[in-house]
Amino acid sequence: MLLCRTEEEAKHALKLATQARENAPWYQHEEIGYNYRMSNISAGIGRGQMKVLPLRVEQKQAIFARYSENLKGLPLTMQPKLDCAKPNRWLTVLLLDADCGVTPADMLGRLNEANIEGRHLWKPMNLQPIFADCPFVSVSEKPVCDDLFARGVCLPSDTKMSMDDVDRVCEVIRGMF
């Protein structure tokens, strides 16, 4: 399911999801399109989930706030919030300070020992083996995406987590510094 601010955005998204074919008597494409479609079952599940979306966002924001409060003062940064945005906090990510002496692998190993699942931040496309021979352009010597990958950790943030669960994750992380 895709939510759009305007009907024009919705029409453009539908165009891209249906191969971006132009209104011509032949297959003509002025944009790269895709063949994305959602099954009726998936659409029905998505519609049903819309009823609980405000609650889920509230839960995710509470989890993020708890992490932020509990991890305050450590050599790491939580995701920032722009004044012009209301983040849904779908994913909670921390960035370790470059000189903190702890790597994402260290942190994930310690969390794993405590039976807590965490993940590396997504590996950038330019570092994927399949794209090794493809050109990559960056405005800086060290691309932002590479830096985020090198320092980022995705923390558990399922809406079924209790605040005690979040506190336990934080306790393990605090024990590393």
Where are these regions (language model features)?
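Glycine-rich phosphate-binding loop of ATP-grasp-fold ATP-dependent ligases
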Residues: 1-2
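PLP-dependent aminotransferase class I/II
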Residues: 5-177
